[in-house]
């Protein structure tokens, strides 16, 4: 099927590539179908809505930038996403891309969790955590 995207123009996708977010994403509850589209020559991935061309979230796998990042999924999430083991899980965080780019932040408090095998996804809001919605991707530069 052909879809229009925010960053990649019109592209062809396969039904098997669609990730289903049964509950939508907070703020976009009506959006249930997305595809993951790598941004060429970057570590970034676009979580693109299948139905709304203007809706594409910039994601990263958090461990490259936050090596100690760790979450625990509750039983409800494991059940909703049909996760049976760590091998099923793909974990991403949404970026708020800033200008200048060095001020870009990552939302570590609400990761995107995907069962890569079943193609089911959910944005998980972590509670009782020190993670916040805005963690700098790059350390602040000290003025000379």
Curated annotation (Swiss-Prot):
Pfam families: FliW. Transmembrane segments: none annotated. It comes from the Bacteria. GO terms for cellular component: cytoplasm. Belongs to the FliW family. Interacts with translational regulator CsrA and flagellin(s). This is Flagellar assembly factor FliW. It comes from Geobacillus kaustophilus (strain HTA426). The lineage of its organism: Bacteria, Bacillati, Bacillota, Bacilli, Bacillales. The gene is fliW.
